[in-house]
């Protein structure tokens, strides 16, 4: 048989495997540097028992960069960890790693070695009487697929959640499966408008994960943030204080504790924690972004305290904080060019000091980006609409972008903000007797989108009467 025929047979077998090469991970080329950086941070600074998968993901990223020899090194590390941490179920736990080995060797043209790893997968499938030669359905592989998807960004979260749910069906008390599920559900919360029931469920899965993983401080700080979201800040702060006394996963604890304290209004404490975290992870886009948000929060605090007219020392402090915030947001973008909200935050900071041209430039960069998450698209249209309404003095453009955001039907917190902003603008126009027919029609649309059909009809009827008064022919 020719080498070409061998290659085709091997390729037909490879596509049946369950591993990073067949999971259709959505990773854009500009995202790879930041993804690799976050993987290395996790390897170095996150104290976890669940670290085999991260070496597999690193191997896949190395392959995407054309570094197949480095990919093999990462896969060997994963193999060693399996023998060390999962010796009693090494076969099952090795399926993904072996699949990745086979793919990397195939891409290197080393077909005999690729076949060796295919044989390992096939033998394990036979051992467990699996009906497929190369595809094993088991909770452990579902879990690893979930971790890979979760690490690759928001556009993969729904699929990650499904994977962890599938894993939990097979083993509902497994600590790792519960941890992955809780983290993914927590991250998805920001994309969705949750009902009271769903919010309670999100809180429940985090508490369950903490119970099953009592030594995992990372999941504890996420629970703290969730409690803060739900108005239970005092209870959340207890978890934060406990986590800060631990030496485990300090870089991660510091960054999430900082987020907690910034949202609480304790911005100085948040900045102190962020600076400590940056000592160990200086290339973290997340940390630089959080620092920018802190500096901007301090600037807004001073403006509010001076009735938005700071003078003297306050003016100097505001100017200094604005420059610090701009510097941090620009650093964020340099480290992660696909950090969409960093462009928005940078634009809004420029708008605060009247640099509208620069603000417009950065808003346009955010609007032009290829964005997969509907909630994020809504959020950017919301912020740009606000910019046009309050800084650009263009109600037309503001309305256009509020409506563009609302055309995206995803139910989310951002959609609620768009509805509220459009409603306030329409009511203000009516109060000022400006474009009343159009504004009343917009109120009708808002009621319709809220499901308030009778109120919507009343608004539309009123708009028709007003239009008829203005133009009897109509």
UniProtKB/Swiss-Prot annotation:
Pfam families in the cross-refs: TPR_7, TPR_8
Stored PROSITE patterns: TPR, TPR_REGION
InterPro entries documented for this protein: TPR-like_helical_dom_sf (IPR011990), TPR_rpt (IPR019734)
A single GO BP: defense response to virus
GO terms for cellular component: cytosol
Keyword Repeat found: yes
Single GO term (MF): RNA binding
Segments annotated as TPR repeats: 52-85, 95-128, 141-174, 182-216, 218-250, 251-284, 305-339, 340-373, 378-412, 437-470
Domain of life: Eukaryota
Key words of the record: Repeat, TPR repeat
Family: Belongs to the IFIT family.
Its job: IFIT1B is likely non-functional, lacking the critical antiviral role of IFIT1. Unlike IFIT1, which is essential in the innate immune response as part of an interferon-dependent multiprotein complex, IFIT1B does not prevent the translation of viral RNAs that lack host-specific 2'-O-methylation at their 5' cap. Consequently, it probably cannot inhibit their translation by competing with the host translation machinery.
Name of the protein described by the UniProt record: Protein IFIT1 homolog B
Lineage: Eukaryota, Metazoa, Chordata, Craniata, Vertebrata
Encoding gene, per UniProt annotation: IFIT1B
């Amino acid at each position: 048989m020719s080498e070409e025929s061998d290659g085709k047979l091997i390729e037909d077998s490879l596509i049946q495997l369950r591993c990073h090469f067949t999971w259709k991970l959505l990773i854009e080329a500009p995202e790879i540097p930041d993804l690799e950086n976050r993987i290395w941070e996790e390897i170095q600074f996150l104290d976890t028992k669940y670290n085999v998968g991260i070496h597999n993901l690193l191997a896949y990223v190395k392959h995407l960069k054309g570094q197949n020899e480095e990919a093999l090194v990462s896969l060997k590390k994963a193999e060693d960890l399996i023998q060390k941490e999962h010796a009693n179920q090494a076969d099952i736990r090795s399926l993904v790693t072996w699949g990745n080995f086979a793919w990397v060797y195939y891409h290197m043209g080393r077909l005999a070695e690729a076949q060796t790893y295919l044989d390992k997968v096939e033998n394990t499938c036979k051992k467990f009487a699996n009906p497929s030669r190369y595809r094993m359905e088991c909770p452990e592989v579902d879990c690893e697929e979930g971790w890979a998807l979760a690490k690759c960004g928001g556009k993969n979260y729904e699929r990650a959640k499904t994977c962890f749910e599938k894993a939990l069906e097979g083993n509902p008390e497994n600590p790792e499966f519960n941890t992955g599920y809780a983290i993914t559900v927590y991250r998805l919360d920001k994309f969705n408008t949750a009902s009271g029931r769903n919010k309670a469920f999100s809180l429940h899965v985090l508490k369950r994960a903490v119970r099953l993983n009592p030594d995992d401080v990372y999941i504890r700080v996420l629970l703290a943030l969730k409690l803060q979201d739900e108005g239970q800040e005092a209870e959340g702060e207890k978890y934060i204080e406990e986590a800060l006394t631990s030496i485990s996963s300090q870089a991660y604890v510091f960054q999430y504790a900082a987020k907690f304290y910034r949202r609480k209004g304790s911005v100085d404490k948040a900045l102190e924690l962020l600076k400590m975290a940056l000592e160990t992870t200086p290339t973290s886009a997340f940390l630089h972004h959080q620092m920018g948000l802190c500096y901007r929060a301090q600037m807004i605090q001073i403006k509010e305290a001076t009735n938005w007219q700071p003078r003297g020392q306050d003016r100097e402090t505001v100017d200094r904080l604005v420059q610090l915030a701009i510097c941090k947001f620009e650093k964020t973008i340099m480290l992660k060019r696909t950090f969409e909200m960093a462009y928005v935050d940078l634009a809004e900071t420029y708008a605060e000091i009247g640099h509208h041209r620069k603000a417009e430039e950065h808003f346009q960069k955010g609007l032009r980006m290829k964005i997969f998450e509907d909630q994020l698209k809504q959020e950017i249209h919301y912020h740009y609409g606000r910019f046009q309404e309050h800084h650009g003095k263009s109600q037309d453009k503001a309305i256009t972008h509020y409506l563009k955001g609302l055309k995206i039907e995803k139910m989310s917190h951002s959609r609620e903000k768009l509805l509220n902003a459009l409603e306030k603008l329409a009511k203000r126009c009516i109060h000022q007797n400006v474009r009343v027919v159009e504004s009343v029609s917009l109120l009708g649309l808002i009621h319709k989108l809220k499901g308030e059909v009778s109120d919507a009809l009343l608004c539309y009827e009123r708009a028709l009467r007003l239009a008829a008064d203005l133009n009897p022919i109509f």
